[in-house]
């Protein structure tokens, strides 16, 4: 095994976390069609190869029964696995060694703070207070979207504060299946788009705006293949009650309960 990758995924190693934070910090804040960043170099090449080689088996995923993801026969084109550290500990030893530092990084306060700093203006405009006072709860997931997956134009639900998605393709051949940003949800504005390149060790993030952050994913084909991504969504947790709600939902995963969102 490559020594660089071994050091990156060492249990308790801050390297993955710091690489994520640095990727956020060096990313340019773009304002069109809405505030967002496109991150590159999220992993060094050796670590990225190690991550893909340790992709969890399908038995650890469950169907996400979202309306846009369902086939006519009722099955889902989107497979989801939660990346909370306690869920990752169920994996076989080699997969666990690689994915546990990633899971911890996605749930880290330093990564949360990096996104808050980057999107300070938009978040403070929406919530009417300093970002330091905006409570959020991270929900990290690993996704394997099967051919036929699509999602229509939407801005994300009000319970979300920040949406983040990391792309995990094997190479650049899937470049054209990245998320599409729109200027509006319908009419001419919906046709004015910006697409995020679906490239190795890249990703995007944006602060959720109920009137601006319109995005979609075009339906994939058999030729496109499987679309593998990793997400962390920061849900609004501005009170002890809402924080407990997200924490309790996390606890219920231990008993096989899987929410639609």
Predicted segments with their positions:
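Catalytic core of Fe(II)/2-oxoglutarate
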Residues: 2-3, 148, 155-161, 168-261
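Hydrophobic residues positioned within well-ordered beta-strands of beta-sheet architectures
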Residues: 39, 138, 162-164, 230
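Short, Φ-rich (hydrophobic/aromatic) sequence segments
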Residues: 1-12, 98-114, 163-167, 233
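Catalytic cores of PAPS-dependent sulfotransferases
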Residues: 28-33, 39-57, 107-122, 145-146, ...
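A contiguous catalytic/ligand-binding core that recognizes phosphate-bearing ligands
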Residues: 120-136, 141-162
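Signature of the catalytic double-stranded beta-helix
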Residues: 79-138
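N-terminal auxiliary "cap/dimerization" subdomain that precedes the catalytic jelly-roll/cupin core
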Residues: 1-81, 255-261
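Active-site rim elements
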Residues: 37, 96-110, 150-151, 189-193, ...
């Amino acid at each position: 095994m490559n020594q660089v990758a071994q050091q990156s995924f060492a249990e308790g190693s801050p390297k993955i976390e710091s690489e994520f934070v640095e990727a956020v910090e060096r990313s340019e804040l773009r304002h069109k069609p809405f505030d967002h960043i496109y991150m590159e170099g999220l992993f060094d090449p050796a670590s990225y190869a190690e991550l893909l080689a340790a992709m969890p088996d399908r038995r650890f995923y469950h169907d996400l029964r979202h309306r846009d993801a369902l086939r006519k026969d009722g099955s889902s084109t989107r497979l989801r696995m939660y990346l909370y550290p306690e869920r990752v500990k169920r994996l076989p030893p080699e997969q666990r060694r690689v994915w546990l530092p990633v899971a911890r990084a996605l749930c880290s306060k330093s990564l949360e703070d990096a996104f808050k700093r980057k999107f300070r203006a938009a978040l403070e405009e929406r919530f009417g207070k300093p970002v330091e006072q905006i409570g959020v709860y991270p929900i990290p997931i690993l996704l394997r979207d099967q051919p036929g997956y699509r999602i229509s134009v939407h801005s994300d639900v009000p319970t979300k504060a920040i949406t983040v998605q990391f792309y995990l393709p094997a190479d650049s051949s899937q470049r054209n299946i990245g998320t599409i940003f729109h200027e509006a949800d319908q009419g001419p504005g919906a046709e004015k788009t910006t697409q995020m390149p679906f490239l190795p060790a890249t990703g995007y993030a944006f602060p959720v705006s109920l009137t601006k952050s319109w995005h979609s994913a075009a339906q994939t084909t058999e030729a496109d293949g499987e679309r593998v991504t990793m997400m962390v969504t920061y849900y609004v947790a501005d009170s002890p009650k809402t924080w407990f709600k997200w924490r309790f939902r996390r606890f219920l995963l231990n008993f096989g309960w899987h929410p639609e969102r």
